Amino acid sequence: RVSRKTWEELRRLDIGGGQSMLLFDELLEMLQDTQHHLYVETKHPSGQGDILEEQMVLRLRYAGLIDDPRIHIISFSHHAIRRMQNLAPHMDRIYLRRDWERHVNRPDVMLSKPTALGVSLLRAKLQPAIIGAQGLPTYLWTVDKPEDMKWAWANGVDMLATNQPEVALHAIEL
């Protein structure tokens, strides 16, 4: 488990392509002089409780990015979305709906106030009307095939998560 490792142990890990992990501060520093957006997913439940969001806001404030529109918080947790609304009300907050929620929450009731709603590719294809629901932008994950990227583009998806950014750029140019 990652939570049981020291930073030194984590830093030595190869996370792919010879890359090592970064501290959040290092990632924020890399973002400073770019036009890139950063989507930060908070994982819950965590052994850290509310400290996770508090520390994230502290680090973003320290980096001068607390009100930067390029920073987006994404989470499957309504609690995390509510915490971020209280701690950083101007920050973009994307609630990620789980696929099983389509069975137990048919009216799509929100227990928090996200600024955008996330949905999986599977759910979006099963329920295309969910794209743009409640008048909010839609974040779609994880879209790696060009035909799915084109489908998302044609159906009004606002943000797309992919493991294939080069493919995405080519797919939307066509």
Regions found by a protein language model. Give the residues of each.
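Metal-dependent phosphodiesterase/phospholipase catalytic core, i.e.
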Residues: 1-92, 112, 119-122, 132-134
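C-terminal active-site rim and adjoining tail of enzyme catalytic domains
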Residues: 19, 94-174
